[in-house]
Amino acid sequence: MSNSSINEILWTKHELISASKGKDLTTKFLNNKKIMGISIDTRSIEQNDLFIALKGKNFDGHDFLEKAIQKGASGVIVSRKDSALRYNGLFVKNTHAALINFAEFSRNRFKGKIIGITGSNGKTTTKDMAKIIFNEFGKTFATPGNNNNLIGLSLSLMKLPYN
């Protein structure tokens, strides 16, 4: 899910390269395009999203790069040099590690307050209620949906606006 509704640029080329220690092999990565959201799934990708080609047991995000570009991805993060060259992508050694590095970078640059909700039951409901309450006092960001694993948390942190 994209956070394009925030209407802010989420990442700059320099930040993505710095956080991932990636390489812009073609020097054309992003080419003045904006990153307004983050996606690892072409079924939900939106215009100006950054697509990260994760590899899993039953899938490889590199197989969906063409579709991501067709659907409006501004850029791609890849762990294959041939894909980086073909799609002007940012080449990283490991896209999973890059995702975690992006999350850490985003968390460190964020200057607002962060609240964590833990427990066995009711976390999503509590999070949704807290967001409604805190919205009354100012700008609020909450994890979209139910992203309670390492990939989901990392994606949520990557979507964290600057303020």
Residue positions per predicted region:
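Phosphate-binding loop of NTP-binding sites
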Residues: 14-20, 98-163
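N-terminal leader/targeting and accessory segments in enzymes
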Residues: 1-101, 105
